[in-house]
From Swiss-Prot:
The keyword Flavoprotein does not apply. Homotrimer. The keyword Signal does not apply. It comes from Levilactobacillus brevis (strain ATCC 367 / BCRC 12310 / CIP 105137 / JCM 1170 / LMG 11437 / NCIMB 947 / NCTC 947). This is Putrescine carbamoyltransferase. It catalyses: carbamoyl phosphate + putrescine = N-carbamoylputrescine + phosphate + H(+). The record marks K28, E144 as: Important for structural integrity. It is an enzyme of class 2 (transferase). Belongs to the aspartate/ornithine carbamoyltransferase superfamily. PTCase family. Keywords: Cytoplasm, Polyamine biosynthesis, Transferase. One of its GO terms (biological process) is arginine biosynthetic process via ornithine. GO terms for molecular function: amino acid binding; ornithine carbamoyltransferase activity; putrescine carbamoyltransferase activity. GO terms for cellular component: cytoplasm. InterPro entries: Asp/Orn_carbamoyltranf_P-bd, Asp/Orn_carbamoylTrfase, Asp/Orn_carbamoylTrfase_sf, Asp_carbamoyltransf_Asp/Orn-bd, Orn/put_carbamltrans, PtcA.
Length: 347
């Protein structure tokens, strides 16, 4: 079966994303019940990092270990990637040795090239364009915190601030799943027109919507989720932090005043790390409506789902046939249930 990469969620259907959401939650519940299904037994993940990382690296390593696999950390300087050896050659070699590759890169072209030449699945751990593993973790988190009586497609999410790769990814996932997406940000820091078109096309298919605005009342009206990111990103070198502060503060700081404009049941999200006192106040990030810690935990939930989905072709075959999907889902559920019962009996 043709290998699949997880480089851009726009190459996946809404149904495939929903399947990964459900798969991630199901595995998470199994582990919380004490059973670690060996779905990645004898599989090895190679992790290429051109940048430092906390959540991405630890969640990927833990996901592989918990499901019976192994992860190798490939730091800058430890491997040849576009240096003395071409990306093509390195990718082909790693594809012969590893079962799956994850790459956190400076430029999106790099991970796209790795995906092109490696014969194994490649996962984008973040580029200057998007952050798809964050996308899946976020949509899982929103699924777990849906307002009473609402589906994802009934919800509105507001991204506050700069059009970072996390902002772009939030638009991609929200519009893919039929949500209403709003970016509340200043001119010059809004999603680029060519990228915006992708979100608009997603929304046209799913029934969602995309809005870019500088009007706080318009942005936050009836919002179910508020999301923000740092104002000084990894890839921004044109302006100093001081200059960016003048643009974003105080209008685009998520504080109690802004939150009060949203719905009564609104939840706050942040991909982390957060610069407290800048893009968000302590009062908001530490509030009872903040779900940032669940969001961080679900980075691992997402990694499990992605790795299992890509390394188990029968899951992808199930997408083509509801009958096969139902059969596999029933067998998987029975396996987990029996394993948990066996573990309890052993205890």
């Amino acid at each position: 079966m043709t290998k699949r990469d997880f480089i851009d969620t726009n190459t996946y259907t809404k149904e495939e994303i929903q399947y990964m959401i459900d798969l991630g939650i199901k595995i998470k519940e199994s582990i919380k019940n004490g059973y670690y299904p060996p779905l990645l037994k004898n599989k090895t993940l190679g992790m290429i990092f051109e940048q430092s990382s906390t959540r991405t690296r630890t969640s990927a390593e833990a996901a592989m270990t918990e499901l019976g696999g192994h992860a190798q950390y490939l730091a800058p300087g430890q491997i040849q990637l576009g240096g003395h050896e071409t990306i093509e050659d390195t990718s082909q070699v790693l594809g012969r040795i590893l079962d799956i590759i994850g790459a956190r890169v400076e430029r999106h072209h790099t991970v796209a090239e790795v995906g092109k030449f490696a014969k194994v699945p490649v996962v984008n751990f973040m580029s200057d364009y998007n952050h798809p593993t964050q996308e899946l973790g976020d949509i899982i988190t929103m699924t777990e915190h849906l307002p009473k009586g609402k589906k994802l497609s009934d919800c509105k999410i507001v991204f506050v601030g700069d059009a970072t790769q996390v902002c772009v990814s939030t638009m991609f996932m929200a519009t893919k799943m039929g949500m209403d997406f709003v970016q509340f940000g200043p001119k010059g820091f809004q999603i680029k027109p060519e990228t915006l078109k992708i979100g608009q096309q997603n929304a046209k298919v799913s029934g969602g919507s995309v809005t870019i605005t500088e009007d706080a009342d318009e942005a936050f009206k009836d919002a179910d989720f508020i999301y923000t990111d740092v104002w000084y990103g990894l890839y921004e070198a044109e302006l100093s932090e001081e200059d960016r502060m003048k643009i974003f503060y105080p209008k685009y700081q998520v504080n109690a005043e802004l939150v009060a404009k949203a719905s009564d049941h609104v939840k706050f999200m942040h991909c982390l790390p957060a610069t407290r006192g800048e893009e968000v106040t302590d009062e908001v990030i530490d509030s009872d409506y903040s779900i940032v810690w669940d969001e961080a935990e679900n980075r691992k939930t997402a990694m499990r789902a992605i790795f299992v989905y890509l390394l188990n072709p029968e899951l992808r075959k199930a997408q083509a046939s509801q009958a096969v999907a139902d059969k596999y889902d029933a067998e998987f559920s029975l396996m987990l249930r029996n394993a948990v019962d066996d573990q309890r009996n052993a205890d």
